[in-house]
Amino acid sequence: DKLNALLIKALVSTGELNEVETYDVDFDHQFLETEKYDAKPTYKKFLGYRPGVYVIGDMIVYVENSDGNTNVRFYQAETHKRFFALLEANSIRVNRFRADCGSCSKEIVSEIEKHCTHFYIRANRCSSLYDDLFSLRGWKTEEINGIQFELNSILVEKWEGKCYRLVIQRQKRMDGELDLWEGEYTYRCILTNDYDSSTRDIVEFYNKRGGKERIFDDMNNGFGWNRLPKSFMSENTVFLLLTALIHNFYKTIISKLDTKAFGLKETSRIKAFVFSFISVPAKWIMTARQYVLNIYTENRAYARPFKTGFG
């Protein structure tokens, strides 16, 4: 909890989070393959851990680790409760919340709904829902990212006493084969309490959640999440949190750095940053009765940050 609090306080201190704005939060579980002493078998058929990760923009704001063999809904509502309590303690407000179907349960949705304006959660389909889907009329054809979809929405009582909007997206099967339950279409549903936005806006907003996979790819390959160093989950959880802290600092630095001068981009991995900006030979030399940092590089971008009155 202290390291998660440090994550958020560091983001507040660097100006990435503030009390004025409201933020969109993404939540997902990342399965990490590792053969550590206490690693458990996951449903993906490898040993590992299953940390739940919260992301705002490109920043990781909260990490809570779990055994690989635990169900994704196991005590998830309590995890959300701790996360939102930490945000609210720092006066950070959440506008919209996105998650996959692992968060689609009455207890979890009720907890999320308390702390955000709108939520968008991939709904798990059930046999009782198909009758409603097949009888729907008024489908609107929309082209999203070059693919033709048909969109619709209905109000459903997903759980007793709880009525939400269900945004439905269907696409004709590419192979032309008929499915036993879905027929000639593939159906995807989004459960939300947003009753004003259009179906297209909701689908497009939810689809942007896929871009957060790039953050996990960066953490796996650039910050060592796919090569955990310790033998036990508690120690590796500390590693996950510390590398998340470094990742956030790196993103802040790279956003304020003149990246082009160093041959970098804002999307450059930390390895490229280290090679271009840090791994440069330098030596303190005495000249004119004072020490001057002599940097051995042809990159003139170093002249500005290290320029002194001497030269």
Question: Predicted regions span which residues?
Answer:
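Short acidic, glycine/serine/threonine-rich loops at helix termini
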Residues: E35-P41, Y62-N65, A99, K106-I112, ...
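Short, conserved catalytic/metal-binding motifs centered on acidic residues
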Residues: E21-F31, D58, V94-C104, F119, ...
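A short, flexible helix-boundary coil/loop motif
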Residues: Y250-G311
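Domain-level cores of phosphate- or acyl-group-handling catalytic modules
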Residues: T70-Y130
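Active-site-proximal, Lys/Arg-enriched surface segment
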Residues: D1-V53
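Electropositive, glycine- and tryptophan-enriched low-complexity nucleic-acid-binding patches
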Residues: K44-N90
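Short amphipathic alpha-helical "interface-anchor" segments enriched in bulky aromatics
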Residues: T199-V238, L242, I246-Y250, I254
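An anionic, glycine-rich sequence signature occurring as long contiguous blocks
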Residues: H118-N221, K307-G311
